[in-house]
Amino acid sequence: MDKTNSLSSCLSSPRCSVLANISGTDLYRDRKDYLHIFEPRGVKIFRIPSPIFFANIEFFKEKLQEAVGFNPLRVLRKRNKALRKIKKLLQENDNHSRDTGLRGLFSKTTDESCVNKEEMDQPTDLEGLPFRMNWNAELPSNISVPRVDLHSLILDFSAVSFLDISALKGLKAGLKEFIRIDVDVYIVSCDVYILEKLHMCMFFDDEIRTSMFFPTLHDAMLHVLEKHKEDKTKGWVISDTKM
């Protein structure tokens, strides 16, 4: 393999890593490389050490899904499918559903042959439900919605020096998949050039906002810990692996 092909291969298939905190410091390193390294429950820090462009954006998204342990789009579609069924049953028998709750609703079946895939990819609409929906609670046996224990995803962009239009579109779609299943997404250490490009290309909207960007990884982590104070009592995950 010549140098050009070798460089292309490295850029298109970079070594992505999951970071965690070295105890007692504001340093974050690959959790595979240390014996005693900590990460809060419900938080994942993902780093990609290269520019992002058309040739590696899908690789990046696949590695991110491997890191978090689930496909956010699949989760979103499952939730929307369940909500569609709930709302249809509420319309058919409102009083019965209020008396018997969620399990009573799912004792019936509905025709799902007319499911529109585009609708399934949209944000879940919980308005109008007579109960508070908790997707991580025990659900009826005839409904399968993957459990998501992740509440915060931090993306380390310190090595992302370039982002082309194709990658920008793919990144935006991928981030929305997480946001729509109630995972807070943060981007840290982003190059000023990249931020300017995001503004120019209309990257930001009602779902993806500038407030998700933090100057450093530790700043983002402090924000997450403050936002989820109640989770501190649940402790930290300790990694005992070493390369």
Predicted regions and their residues:
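Short acidic-hydrophobic, aromatic-tinged amphipathic segments that line or gate anion-handling sites
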Residues: 206-224
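Short, hydrophobic alpha-helical segments
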Residues: 68, 224-228
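Flexible, disordered linker segments and immediate boundary regions flanking tandem C2H2 zinc-finger modules
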Residues: 73-79, 209-211, 234-236
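C-terminal helix/juxtamembrane-tail motif
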Residues: 228-243
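The feature marks cytosolic C-terminal regulatory regions of anion transporters and related permeases
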Residues: 1-201
